[in-house]
């Protein structure tokens, strides 16, 4: 029997506000443990929460960018459960009246566009963080409450995803949108973008959902894809063996490449939701919604279309460049100085991204300013350096932080375009390779490429390749 996966994602994005959701404590990452806390976020008696208006603003931007219907009336609720990192023993969240519902997001996998439904977008606060310590006589855990009360948006998809690759594409697209909106830094390694996956399998063609498990602890796009691949295979193996999938919360173990049972999956009633008595409901008028809509920035899909329409870039190239706001901004700044967009795209898609990935850097961390890359391309265009040398110069720019012209001058990399000087070297190469010359004259076109290579080798790659070709053909 052939099975298909049914996947829905619950994504938590920490918002880039200066203060927490319901108090004035800092949201800065990396502070000393338990220094960004106050009686409100610790849940001490005698204090009341106050909603941070920017949290609502960021929620509206996200909801509109995801094509959701914003509720004119919503409220907060208490989600009750007991865990050491939750000092109040409840989390302020939204239950039956969330901020927004009924949106969608478009993804593209293997050239196929799919529309993934967004069930809801709601606001809530984050919990603290447990730090597990191994010590003599047994381990113990410490609690850091700095993250407690940091504002989150939870974005819940419909169970419309049908493969781990689609789930990864969805997460990557969602991260891009959040970064374009500038509402979250989306640093998965710091926990500011987290994802839980609800996954089940069913016979292909069936409309009935199978028993789902929830998979947690996936802190990268690669981990998300690997965890889902394993969990889907695990569930199929159980069903094919005549067993039954048990509803549970699973943890992804990255080092072992397996999912393991954390606990039996809770139902909504286990959390005993009830309206938050210390916060009044929110009424969001149409004027506020329309102002936020007008102020939305150019989003990834629109920017991708602009690069295709304005510069004639292929859909794939435009999609890669606009998948990151920082990378798209970098491209625009290079093109502003060097207007051949296709050349810029080729360099960014090739050597630039290769060097970034080799150093595990994001586009916003590139050590080469866009103006310097434009300068490098100008040096190549004007014939000062060859394409091969330009690639070497870019590598040194990444390594040293120096500008292109400085490197070219210091290392004496200026392209040789002197006809007399090159002619002498060409003559020497022809004299040293009579058999190759004979091959070319007998119709073997590849022989010319060998001779060009020998001239380039003799000049340390500094010869003007166009002039070398011209001189060789004249002599042959």
Swiss-Prot record:
Lipid metabolism in keyword set: no
Enzyme Commission no: 6.3.5.-
Keywords per UniProt: ATP-binding, Ligase, Nucleotide-binding, Protein biosynthesis
GO biological process: glutaminyl-tRNAGln biosynthesis via transamidation; translation
Gene3D superfamilies: 1.10.10.410, GatB domain, N-terminal subdomain
Reactions catalysed according to its record: L-glutamyl-tRNA(Gln) + L-glutamine + ATP + H2O = L-glutaminyl-tRNA(Gln) + L-glutamate + ADP + phosphate + H(+); L-aspartyl-tRNA(Asn) + L-glutamine + ATP + H2O = L-asparaginyl-tRNA(Asn) + L-glutamate + ADP + phosphate + 2 H(+)
SUPFAM superfamilies: GatB/YqeY motif, Glutamine synthetase/guanido kinase
Highest taxon, organism lineage: Bacteria
Enzyme class, spelled out: ligase
InterPro entries, per the entry: Asn/Gln-tRNA_amidoTrfase_suB/E, Asn/Gln-tRNA_Trfase_suB/E_cat, Asn/Gln_amidotransferase, Asn/Gln_tRNA_amidoTrase-B-like, GatB, GatB_C_1, GatB_Yqey_C_2, Gln-tRNA_amidoTrfase_suB_CS
Pfam families according to UniProt: GatB_N, GatB_Yqey
NCBIfam families to which the protein is assigned, alphabetical: gatB, PRK05477.1-2, PRK05477.1-4, PRK05477.1-5
Subunit structure, interactors included: Heterotrimer of A, B and C subunits.
Family membership noted in the UniProt record: Belongs to the GatB/GatE family. GatB subfamily.
Function of the molecule: Allows the formation of correctly charged Asn-tRNA(Asn) or Gln-tRNA(Gln) through the transamidation of misacylated Asp-tRNA(Asn) or Glu-tRNA(Gln) in organisms which lack either or both of asparaginyl-tRNA or glutaminyl-tRNA synthetases. The reaction takes place in the presence of glutamine and ATP through an activated phospho-Asp-tRNA(Asn) or phospho-Glu-tRNA(Gln).
Official protein name in the record: Aspartyl/glutamyl-tRNA(Asn/Gln) amidotransferase subunit B
Organism encoding this protein: Moorella thermoacetica (strain ATCC 39073 / JCM 9320)
Gene of this entry: gatB
């Amino acid at each position: 029997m052939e099975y298909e996966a049914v996947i829905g994602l619950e994504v938590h994005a920490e918002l880039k506000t200066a203060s927490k959701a319901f108090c004035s404590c800092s949201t800065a990452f990396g502070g000393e443990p338990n220094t960004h806390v106050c009686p409100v976020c610790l849940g001490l008696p005698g204090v009341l929460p106050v909603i941070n208006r920017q949290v609502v603003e960021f929620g509206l931007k996200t909801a509109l960018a995801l094509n959701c219907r914003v509720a004119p009336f919503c409220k907060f609720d208490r989600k009750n459960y007991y865990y050491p990192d939750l000092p109040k023993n409840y989390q302020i969240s939204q239950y039956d009246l969330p901020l927004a519902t009924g949106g969608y997001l478009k993804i593209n996998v293997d050239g196929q566009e799919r529309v993934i439904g967004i069930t809801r977008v709601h606001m809530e606060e984050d919990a603290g963080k447990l730090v597990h310590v191994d010590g003599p006589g047994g381990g113990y855990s410490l609690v850091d409450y700095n993250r407690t009360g940091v504002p989150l948006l939870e974005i819940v998809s419909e169970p419309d995803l049908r493969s781990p690759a689609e789930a990864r594409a969805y997460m990557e697209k969602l991260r891009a949108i959040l970064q374009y909106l500038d509402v979250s830094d989306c640093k998965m390694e710091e926990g500011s973008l987290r994802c839980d996956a609800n996954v089940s399998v069913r016979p292909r063609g069936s409309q009935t959902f199978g028993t789902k498990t929830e998979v947690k602890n996936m802190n990268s796009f690669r981990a998300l894809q690997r965890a889902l691949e394993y969990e889907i295979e695990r569930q199929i193996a159980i069903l094919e063996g005549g067993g039954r999938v048990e509803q549970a919360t699973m943890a992804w173990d990255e080092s072992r490449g397996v999912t393991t049972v954390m606990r039996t999956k809770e139902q909504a009633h286990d959390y005993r939701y009830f309206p938050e008595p210390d916060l009044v409901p929110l009424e969001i008028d149409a004027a506020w919604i329309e102002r936020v809509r007008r102020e939305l920035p150019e989003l990834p899909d629109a920017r991708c279309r602009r690069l295709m329409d304005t510069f004639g870039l292929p859909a794939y190239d435009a999609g890669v460049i606009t998948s990151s706001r920082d990378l798209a901004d970098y491209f625009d700044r290079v093109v502003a100085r060097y207007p051949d967009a296709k050349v810029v795209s080729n360099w960014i898609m090739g050597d630039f991204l290769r060097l970034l990935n080799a150093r595990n850097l994001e586009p916003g961390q590139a050590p080469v300013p866009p103006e310097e890359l434009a300068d490098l391309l100008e040096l190549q265009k004007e014939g000062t350096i060859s394409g091969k040398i330009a690639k070497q110069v870019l590598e040194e720019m990444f390594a040293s932080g120096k500008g292109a012209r400085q490197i070219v001058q210091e290392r004496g990399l200026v392209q040789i375009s002197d006809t007399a000087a090159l002619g002498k070297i060409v003559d020497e190469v022809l004299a040293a390779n009579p058999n190759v010359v004979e091959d070319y004259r007998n119709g073997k076109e590849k022989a010319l490429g060998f001779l060009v290579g020998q001239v380039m080798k003799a000049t340390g790659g500094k010869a003007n390749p166009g002039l070398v070709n011209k001189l060789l053909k004249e002599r042959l």
